[in-house]
């Protein structure tokens, strides 16, 4: 009897990707986040599709259409809450996924890593344009502040900002095009995710030890499908707890007020998952300098493979690098906290010190630790 799973042209691709895929036998729960991100993306596309059926991208009716979804549409409140909190879950998984890649040296698969960084940037763009759509106060002012940063680019900046706005300020044209962007970008993310997987399956997965695992591999199904299912249960549990019991805890109260160009909120800030980058942007008193630091804070991920100096791939057996990694984690949490605080002392100086430490850790301290660990491992007799 012919096994259709192994012979059918389409089923064969699925089989080689998710069923008979040879996987290292020792990968831990930190390897769950790839599949969780895939599920998050599907949840976001489905809930977003149903929201788009009832949403209107017009400045006069956008805010009331969101209220209409929550009040009048069958289970509209649930779809809305799942979509809003699903974005938070998405970025939580994303940060853990990137963190795991840095800790275990997965960035040495350069193609997979670079596509991953492009994915991260695309997802950040998607989340930003999506946050503008409800047309609340923070949506409007967030869009104004962030798009206004383009005007810091010398010579073409103002023209570029007005081109993005479709006018001389954030208005109806901006909202309409942001809705179009928010609809198309998740499908671009999906295509990039497939390319990400394609490159990953060229090399096979990394593992906690960082040693070539070819001698000890097991099929993905049933071992890791079961393991991923456990992660999924936790993901759904946390998402449902958020969406049903505390749906607005991660949002901003200002977004319950319709957008008003004549009234600026006291503290303009983005969603929590952008606060670390926002803190780095604000820590530099110069507009262009801030924009460059903001870009550098994300694009620095692209040069991490070039900064790998250690003889060992993973940080599992490198205690000094481990310490620096957890300092970097604490530093990012500090930046996230600072990004949500008003621009006053002592928050300004804390933000500036944390921003300096962020770049110092990645560019200087971690590569130096790798070299020092190499020296310590050399026989001294």
Swiss-Prot record:
Cofactor comment: Binds 2 heme b groups non-covalently.
Sorted UniProt keywords: Electron transport, Heme, Iron, Membrane, Metal-binding, Mitochondrion, Mitochondrion inner membrane, Respiratory chain, Transmembrane, Transmembrane helix, Transport, Ubiquinone
One term under GO cellular component: mitochondrial inner membrane
Domain of life: Eukaryota
Residues noted as binding a ubiquinone in the record, renumbered to the chain: 201
TM helices/strands, residue ranges: 33-53, 77-98, 113-133, 178-198, 226-246, 288-308, 320-340, 347-367
One biological process term in Gene Ontology: mitochondrial electron transport, ubiquinol to cytochrome c
Any one GO molecular function term: metal ion binding
Main location per the UniProt record: mitochondrion
Gene3D superfamilies membership: Cytochrome Bc1 Complex, Chain C
Keyword Hydrolase: no
Cofactor: heme b
Compartments, record wording: Mitochondrion inner membrane
Membrane topology note: Multi-pass membrane protein
UniProt: heme b b562 binding residues: 83, 182
Ligand binding (heme b b566): 97, 196
Note, other: Heme 1 (or BL or b562) is low-potential and absorbs at about 562 nm, and heme 2 (or BH or b566) is high-potential and absorbs at about 566 nm.
Subunit structure: The cytochrome bc1 complex contains 11 subunits: 3 respiratory subunits (MT-CYB, CYC1 and UQCRFS1), 2 core proteins (UQCRC1 and UQCRC2) and 6 low-molecular weight proteins (UQCRH/QCR6, UQCRB/QCR7, UQCRQ/QCR8, UQCR10/QCR9, UQCR11/QCR10 and a cleavage product of UQCRFS1). This cytochrome bc1 complex then forms a dimer.
Record function comment: Component of the ubiquinol-cytochrome c reductase complex (complex III or cytochrome b-c1 complex) that is part of the mitochondrial respiratory chain. The b-c1 complex mediates electron transfer from ubiquinol to cytochrome c. Contributes to the generation of a proton gradient across the mitochondrial membrane that is then used for ATP synthesis.
Family that this chain belongs to: Belongs to the cytochrome b family.
Identification of the protein by name: Cytochrome b
Classification lineage: Eukaryota, Metazoa, Chordata, Craniata, Vertebrata
